[in-house]
Amino acid sequence: MKIKFVFDLLTPDDILHPSNHVNLIIRPI
């Protein structure tokens, strides 16, 4: 969970690259 939140904060450009953002969140989990 912590890693998910960290990536969430480090990737505010998820609007420009939603697929990349999703990958970063799913991988740690």
From Swiss-Prot:
Q: Which superkingdom does the taxonomy of this entry point to?
A: Viruses
Q: Read off the InterPro entries from this record.
A: Corona_NS1
The protein's matches in Pfam families, at most eight in alphabetical order, are given as: Corona_NS1 (PF06145)
Q: What family is this protein classified in? A: Belongs to the coronaviruses ns4.9 protein family.
Q: Spell out the protein name for this chain.
A: Truncated non-structural protein of 4.9 kDa
Give the species. Answer: Bovine coronavirus (strain 98TXSF-110-LUN)
